[in-house]
């Protein structure tokens, strides 16, 4: 048994020798017809087989039976063919020679077709096609293959279906993608799991065609259909950008002759950058539709592959198709995914992808390479889109690649009004549409947000009709959802209109995109809510509001008013309120930074936060940045503890320089101007120092009335008398606290009287704040700024005026105050 594994016939699973098993199976009875019966018999008679598992033994028995059956069938076939072989020996020799010759011909044909298909797929020049290819005739004879005439085989043994496949393959390789009449087309190739869609419309052909072609990243279906998509007329608020694109992009594509004549190279790349939702992708599609050239659209993440080298090959394939169909446009969305800075990349594959992208953008390759596409037919315009332009590799942003950068910033109030005009064209409006009002209610909204507002306004209009249908439904209670299935008669459809109120409600349902980018919602604080302060209002109108609303006039005179304001004074005087009112009046984007929220414990992160803050503000200019409690970031250098913010302070000074601001207006507020570094107080940074003192008697009365405007004040209450006679030294915050305490006293009194009475019903209309409630509140509230602090701030204002010698004039009319 130990030598069984070396027996003839080869070993099998379980240590069983095939020859031995076959001999043992011969001893079984003839009545055992199945493998299962043979296994049971062997296990019952032989102990070594009983020790094996039934499954292993059954597998080996079946293999032996299969070998026997195959041998039997082969022997029968040989017996049947003995006579035929003896009678046709010479014929078989001749047949063999014919088969060898035909096989050689087939291999040569296949090699020839593969070579020709490869040449057709690489070459884009019309001259590369022969006259026979232009006519659609394809030669597959041995003359075309070998260059000499060969005698045909005696018997044509090649499969007819195989010949048909060869002919179809060759004819499809000769078939051009589009005729010259259809060359002015838009082609959209969208790579999605190896599938590519190519949208094409000929100049004279409107019928839809479907064919198969390899896509940008692999083989896929190619759909050719009519051009559909956005155009330049679908945009609002970016007229200057559209004019620039028409001159620098569309004109070179549609009229290349002037550029060739004068020897000027057309633009090779455009980089769109801006916050999400501002229309970067839509604008790229509009360029392709306006130009009418092949358009290859791909997301950057679709290029990346897990196989080494496949990502680079996908990029080469994409640009190869673009250069073969030049002039064409390649659009790479979210290009920062494959074009990030190489020094920050951790993996070599990511660095190779960036390098391959740089190489492909430089041109179609080596002109000496016969397989390289010919770029003489035109050029390829590469468009990239990203909301992180600083993350791109610097080599991508040099001349010859993305040489033109267009910032699609968040729209201002006038631009939002133009966008709303475009969006409202598709809506069925009732009555006049006040686009200026909606634009004023939507600070920080981008184009996508305004489209969402229009969509939600339409839903509000439909819901209004649905609510009326619900109320008119019969109250039988059988089916309370029958209104969902009720048909819409024509008279009810005619009632569907979008009203102005629908837009106003929809605005509150959409979150501004800029709030996700670090911007703040522009506060709903108007100058009417800030009584007095005529001097401050004049300053803000002169240096912030008017330059934002009428920039052309200031630019014509060469006036540079990009200066900063530093509001200082006792706490609670309304410095923050004034800044919010100025931002609201200007209608610009608004960023509210609260003190030390930019500080970070990690080295370099605080400076990065400052750079990012101003970069976002410049991207979405005009923008107002308000630094509340700015003294936390501007502590004088050299003092104790100043080293914590020293690096941040230096970066802050650089960003505040007028040359770097570019329509970014800065307002700071502090109650400790003495600790601010003097470098911040020079012109061009916080150039205007405005002192906001405590209000006088008349101003206190104005503030108290503004605060009590939304409170149920009893008509018998003398607010003027309370403010002038009982609130000496009160700041705006103290007066707001006083009204709150009086309101709380009135509420407590009303609740106590309702609990003590037998009748639980309370008349809400009789709930008012009376004089006794204010008297009770006055006993609980005291001024937050004492006389010594007032003298300190007055002396500090005089000192700053003498040391700086600029606009530090004390405001003689104190601020009004209102609840936010």
From Swiss-Prot:
User: Mind telling me which Pfam families this protein's record contains?
Assistant: AAA, AAA_lid_3
Coiled-coil residues are 85-122
Q: What keywords would UniProt list here?
A: ATP-binding, Cell cycle, Cell division, Coiled coil, Cytoplasm, Cytoskeleton, Nucleotide-binding, Nucleus, Protein transport, Repeat, Transport
Low complexity bias located where? 121-142
Q: Where is the composition biased (Basic and acidic residues)?
A: 97-119
Q: Name one GO cellular component term.
A: cytoskeleton
Which residues lie within the region annotated Disordered?
72-157, 169-188
Residues the entry annotates as binding ATP = 274-281, 569-576
Its annotated compartments are: Nucleus; Cytoplasm, Cytoskeleton, Phragmoplast
Q: Which GO terms describe its molecular function?
A: ATP binding; ATP hydrolysis activity
Amino acid composition bias (Acidic residues), ranges on this chain: 76-87
Q: What is its main location?
A: nucleus
Which Gene Ontology terms describe the biological processes this protein takes part in?
A: cell division; protein transport
Function, as annotated: Probably functions in cell division and growth processes. Interacts with certain SNAREs as part of specialized membrane fusion events where vesicles from the same organelle fuse (homotypic fusion).
Similarity comment text for this entry: Belongs to the AAA ATPase family.
According to UniProt, the name of this protein is Cell division control protein 48 homolog C
Q: Which organism is it from?
A: Arabidopsis thaliana
Q: Which gene encodes it?
A: CDC48C
């Amino acid at each position: 048994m130990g030598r069984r594994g070396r027996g003839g016939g080869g070993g099998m699973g379980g240590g069983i020798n095939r020859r031995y098993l076959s001999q043992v199976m011969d001893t079984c009875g003839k009545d055992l017809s199945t493998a299962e019966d043979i296994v049971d018999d062997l296990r019952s008679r032989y102990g070594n087989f009983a020790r094996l598992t039934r499954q292993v033994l059954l597998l080996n028995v079946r293999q032996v039976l299969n070998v026997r059956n195959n041998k039997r069938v082969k022997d029968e076939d040989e017996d049947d063919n003995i006579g035929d072989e003896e009678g046709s020996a010479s014929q078989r020799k001749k047949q063999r020679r014919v088969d060898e010759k035909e096989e050689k011909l087939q291999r040569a044909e296949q090699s020839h077709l593969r070579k020709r298909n490869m040449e057709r797929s690489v070459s884009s020049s019309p001259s590369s096609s022969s006259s026979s290819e232009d006519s659609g005739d394809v030669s597959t004879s041995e003359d075309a293959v070998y260059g000499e005439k060969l005698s045909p085989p005696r018997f044509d043994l090649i499969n007819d279906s195989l010949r048909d496949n060869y002919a179809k393959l060759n004819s499809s390789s000769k078939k051009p993608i589009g005729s010259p009449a259809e060359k002015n087309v838009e082609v959209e190739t969208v790579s999605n799991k190896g599938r590519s869609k190519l949208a094409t419309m000929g100049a004279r052909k409107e019928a839809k065609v479907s064919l198969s072609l390899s896509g940008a990243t692999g083989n896929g279906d190619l759909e050719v259909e009519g051009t559909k998509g956005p155009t330049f007329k679908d945009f609002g608020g970016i007229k200057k950008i559209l004019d620039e694109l028409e001159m620098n992009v569309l004109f070179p594509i549609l009229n290349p002759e002037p550029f060739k004549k004068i020897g000027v190279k057309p633009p090779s790349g455009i980089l769109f950058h801006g916050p999400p939702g501002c229309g970067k992708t839509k604008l790229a599609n509009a360029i392709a539709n306006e130009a009418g050239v092949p358009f290859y659209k791909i997301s950057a993440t679709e290029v990346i592959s897990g196989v080494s080298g496949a990502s680079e090959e996908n990029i080469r394939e994409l640009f190869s198709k673009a250069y073969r169909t030049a002039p064409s446009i390649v659009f790479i969305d979210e290009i920062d995914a494959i074009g990030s800075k190489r020094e920050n990349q951790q993996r070599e594959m990511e660095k190779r992808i960036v390098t391959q992208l740089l190489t492909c953008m430089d041109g179609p390759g080596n002109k000496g390479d016969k397989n390289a596409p010919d770029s003489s037919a035109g050029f390829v315009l590469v468009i990239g889109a990203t909301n992180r332009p600083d993350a791109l590799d610097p080599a991508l942003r040099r001349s010859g690649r993305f040489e033109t950068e267009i910032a699609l910033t968040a729209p201002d109030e006038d631009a939002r009004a133009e966008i709303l005009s475009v969006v409202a064209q598709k809506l069925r409006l009732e009555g006049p549409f006040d686009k200026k009002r909606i634009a004023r209610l939507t600070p920080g909204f981008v184009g996508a947000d305004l489209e969402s507002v229009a969509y939600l306004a339409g839903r509000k209009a439909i819901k209004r009709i649905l609510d009326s249908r619900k109320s008119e439904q019969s109250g039988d209670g059988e089916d309370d959802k029958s209104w969902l299935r009720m048909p819409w008669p024509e008279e009810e459809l005619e009632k569907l209109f979008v009203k102005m109120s629908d837009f106003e409600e929809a605005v509150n349902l959409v979150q501004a995109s800029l709030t996700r980018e670090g911007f703040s919602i522009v506060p709903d604080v108007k100058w009417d809510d800030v009584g007095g302060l005529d001097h401050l209002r004049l300053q803000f109108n002169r240096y912030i509001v008017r330059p934002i609303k009428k920039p052309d006039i200031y630019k014509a005179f060469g006036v540079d008013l990009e200066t900063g304001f530093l509001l200082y004074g006792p706490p609670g005087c309304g410095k923050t309120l004034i800044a919010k009112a100025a931002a609201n009046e200007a209608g610009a984007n608004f960023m509210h930074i609260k003190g030390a929220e930019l500080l970070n414990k990690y080295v370099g992160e605080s400076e990065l936060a400052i750079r990012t803050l101003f970069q976002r503000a410049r991207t979405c200019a005009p923008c107002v940045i308000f630094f509340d409690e700015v003294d936390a970031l501007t502590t004088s250098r050299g003092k104790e503890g100043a080293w914590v913010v020293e690096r941040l302070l230096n970066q802050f000074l650089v960003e505040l320089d007028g040359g770097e601001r570019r329509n970014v207006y800065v307002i700071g507020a502090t109650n400790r101007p003495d600790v601010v570094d003097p470098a911040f107080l020079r012109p061009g940074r916080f150039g205007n120092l405005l002192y906001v003192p405590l209000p006088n008697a008349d101003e206190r009365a104005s503030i108290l009335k503004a605060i009590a405007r939304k409170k149920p004040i009893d008509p018998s209450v003398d607010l003027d008398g309370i403010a002038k006679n009982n609130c000496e030294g009160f700041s705006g915050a103290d007066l707001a606290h006083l009204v709150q305490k009086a309101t709380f006293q009135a509420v407590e009194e009303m609740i106590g009287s309702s609990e003590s009475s037998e009748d639980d019903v309370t008349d809400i209309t009789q709930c008012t704040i009376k004089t006794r409630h204010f008297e009770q509140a006055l006993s609980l509230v005291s001024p937050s700024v004492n006389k010594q602090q007032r003298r300190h701030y007055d002396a500090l204002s005089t000192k700053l005026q003498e040391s700086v010698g600029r606009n530090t004039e004390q405001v003689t009319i104190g601020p009004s105050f209102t609840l936010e």
